[in-house]
Amino acid sequence: MRRITWCVAALVAIAFGIQVGNARVYGKAFEKATHGKVALKSCDVIGFGPDGVLLVGDGAAASIYAIQTGEGKSTKQLTGTITGINAKLAAAIGAKPDGIEILDMAAHPTSGTVYFAARKQDDKIPLILTVNAAGEVGLFNTDSVEYARVQLPSKPESKITKVSDVAWVDDKLIASAGAAETFASKIFIVKTPLTHDASGELHSAETYHVAHGKWETKAPMSTIMPFQEDGKTYVAGAFACTPVVKYPVEALKADANVKGTSVIELGSGNRPLDMFTYSKGGKEFVLANTFRFHHARAPVGPSPYWTVKFERGLLDEEQNVNEKAVWRTKKGTPNSDKITVVEAYHGVTQMDRLGETNVVALRENADKTLDLAVLELP
């Protein structure tokens, strides 16, 4: 009985990275972690890795933090709509409804808890808030947690300015970021399992911007997404003005400058926010939401925030790429029946997958208040 009990304890330890006897045992995410306070300087972006590990991009510290949340699988998920979620999140920290800025949002892959990267407006302190399946708002306390910090190479002449996205791809942690230099668009690769205080590899990304008709190095990669093509792993990145570009992960070598392949052009005047794959009706799609900074002069819909759905197979294109990449529209009219605007998602400022059939979305209303809504995948 004692042996069985120990084995069960060991399995729990492997899942959550806890102490068994005198040994520290970790899951897929960590090779070596540490315990203590995560003192964030910024909270640019969040995401999740294996075992529900929370990934936090801290551009001000040129670091990525991987933090154990302690959450397991839940049989319940958030449903319906929580109106005025911005006021409820602010109230959790004693602030007025306009007292916080929501920077990013991600759903825990097993518990369904929604995490928010936020910043207080008065003192600019970064923090992480949560909403559970019951709609209860909480503050995620990072004062005493199991975590690993990965340092991103940052020199005075190429200082990291912001981490724009993080993703766990096979056995690698990948982050996109901006730097203050000619090759401003950066991709960072970190081998996993993670070791506390390890450093990531630096790559400079060069991209053909279809709408601009030229190769560029400064435009930031706003969001990244892993996918498989012919047995190889790729990272798809969406940039401002708005090409969707793919990079083979095997081509990302240390200190190398890499050229991506532009496969789709969503149109100039947009900044992508979130992007992920999903399946529906036996077909694979990609869902991406964007902020249109040319909304006043050329709106896509009633809100500057709009969402597009396209067939996943478009990412596999090898011939019609870069200068020949397919456009979402031409002269203001739809150009491909494989790329469609999702009108039901107008106003969505942040979104993430919630299970197999739904999306949890932060939606902006006409009065600038925010609702948290569970929507069906289109």
Task: Please annotate each region the language model reported.
Residues 1-4:
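Positively charged n-region of N-terminal signal peptides that target proteins for export
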Residues 8-19:
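Bacterial N-terminal signal peptides
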